[in-house]
Amino acid sequence: FQTNRGVSLVQRLALQDERNRRNKLSCIWLLRYGIHRGKALFKNVARDIVYLPVYYTSDGLKPLASPFLLDTDGKVIVLKGDTLNRQQLKLYRKYPPSDNAYAMGRRIVGGKIQAANRADFSDSVTIYRVPEWKSAYSLKVTTDTAWRYWRYLSAENGLCNIAELVFYQRDSMRPIVGEIIGTEGSCFNDPNHVKEKVFDGDPLTFFDAPTGSGAWVGMDFGKEVNIGKLIFIPRTDGNMIQLGDTYELYWWGPEGWQLIGGPRIARDVVLEYLAPSNALYWLRDVSRGREERIFTYSDGKQIFW
């Protein structure tokens, strides 16, 4: 609660009855509130935060007005979802990464996806070089050339920190598997961080190689295969979109949280929705986890609050 940057906020809200007047508050649980001349008065309100005006009833919390952002300049920006003008959302996370998760995940930047027909990768070609950090990567392979060996080659000083690597043959939605190959061992000889963890289906486990640079992990498919798509995940906190999990996306409307569409099973590491614009959103992972956070969407990116 940032009282050092606080401002006084008078929010003009329609008061439905005397009972509601006594029960008004603005979520994130403001410490001080009250009614003054028909207006809700909140003092020492922190900036750069989204607020949800609600009131209590016997049935729980009810929306009183649209959410709003109090920006760094003290300006109120109302987040009233527009159902007539919808926007396309591409969602990669349900919760923002911590500084540590971001720092560990960035070790993938500069890493390479390579393919070869020789076991020593002396004839390898680089299919993709990771230019920037993302929560997860969904890569369409444009070359039609078939290769037997595929791998992820660590970035410089990256310790080959990769959590998951999934291959799909062209025009197939089912992963293809082969023999796991790559650098043997792990940092400090930890059996929980060996190369096999990259293919265990658990994004919270990862390969931590015994050497900072030059380590790699991949698969020998036993024959040349035409890979059309790869999904790979850097070292992560588990709050990205997880394959096979069921998700629900909500937006804050006149009746509170409203489900967009219905539950959706993640077939990729990005979820796409057509949603009301200028709204406040909430993405739930129904399958697991507890960390979730509201967000807005601007310039093609999620902005968590």
Task: Give the ranges of each region predicted by the language model.
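Long, low-hydrophobicity ectodomains and other hydrophilic envelope-associated domains
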Residues: 8-18, 22-27, 48-67, 88
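Disordered, acidic Ser/Thr/Pro-rich linker "stalks" and the adjacent N-terminal cap
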Residues: 71-146, 157-227, 235-242, 273-277, ...
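Short, conserved beta-strand segments of beta-strand-rich sandwich/propeller modules, principally
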Residues: 50-52, 147-151, 280-282
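Short, solvent-exposed S/T- and G/P-enriched segments that are highly enriched in secreted/extracellular
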Residues: 24-46, 137-138, 265-271
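Short Pro-Gly-centered beta-turn/loop motif in secreted/extracellular proteins
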Residues: 33-62, 68-76, 275-277
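Short amphipathic beta-strand segments in non-cytosolic proteins
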Residues: 6-37, 112-120, 124-128, 132, ...
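Surface-exposed loop/turn motifs at beta-strand-loop junctions within extracellular Ig-like
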Residues: 56-60, 156, 287
